[in-house]
Amino acid sequence: SEDERPVGIQIYGRDLDAMVEAAKIVEEARPDVIDLNFGCPVKKVAGKGAGAGMLRNIPLMLEITREVVKAVKIPVTVKTRLGWDCNNIIITELAEQLQDCGIQALTIHGRTRSQMYTGEADWTLIGEVKNNPRIHIPIIGNGDIKTPEQAREAFNRYGVDAVMVGRATFGCPWIFKEMKEYIFRMENTCIKDGAEQQSSSLSSLPSPLSTFSPLTLDDKIDILEEQLRINVERIDEYRGILHTRRHLASSPIFKGIPDFRQTRIAMLRAETVADLTAILEECRVRLKPDKQ
């Protein structure tokens, strides 16, 4: 819906003509941006030369980027990684090359393809790209952003224009609201104290302080149930549940449930909306403190 904009659609591939055609098809859906995925590290993608596999074929990556930019009228962005492995860290030069291709923003995950999701994301290199005087497009940092505090540090320490949150959203779709509220609250405090620390990338956004209220446990379970309903309505019950149940089973709000392992297994095996909803309602009861 229009309320959910801006909306981006991400595509990946290694065939030039197919990528251009895919971008044209995607443009018909009227997204606000088309993102080219040159960062997915999984074997079934990168092993075939797509996603992060493009980091081993920079000329083709740049050609695809240039041609997609020329083929569509909406903004094109790119997401990629630092390089293929620790011996091939190329992001500083690559960022300039991609910018020259005409992209409107660049998202950098702070690991190489070989690292997959192991170790820690190297935000120092992301910061170096952002602070490169030759870079004028927005730089979006990605990797290990799990808390509001980490998100704010990324803005203040590395100067990025935005942060992208990935795995931390599993079972926690409210994380964006919590991060946004925390950042604005802290920046507002700094301003009141006379500190000139407000990030320019945040100053133009409307403040949520007047409308934000902390989410209760009931609120969060309601949101998870809504997420389940929306996914089923937009796809179908079978695939909607497949997409949703692993997110629900990963939710951090259930860590307070004793012996949650069996409940988690039940979530991952649930096949109907009714089954999953019943499990969530059981969790709601089990998480509430005993009444004296």
Predicted regions and their residues:
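Conserved strand-turn element in the central/C-terminal portion of the radical SAM core barrel
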Residues: R5-L16, P75-D85, I140-G141
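Alpha/beta enzyme core
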Residues: V20-A50, P59-I137
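Glycine- and other small-residue-rich loops at beta-strand/loop junctions that grip anionic moieties
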Residues: I11, G53, N57, K79, ...
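Alpha/beta catalytic cores of nucleotide-metabolism and tRNA/nucleoside-modifying enzymes
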Residues: A71-K73, N87-A105, Y117, T124, ...
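Short, flexible micro-motifs
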Residues: L16, V42, A52-M54, C86, ...
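Short, solvent-exposed beta-strand edge segments and adjacent coil->beta transition regions
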Residues: E4-G8, G49, R264
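Glycine-rich, positively charged N-terminal anion/phosphate-binding segment
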Residues: S1-D32
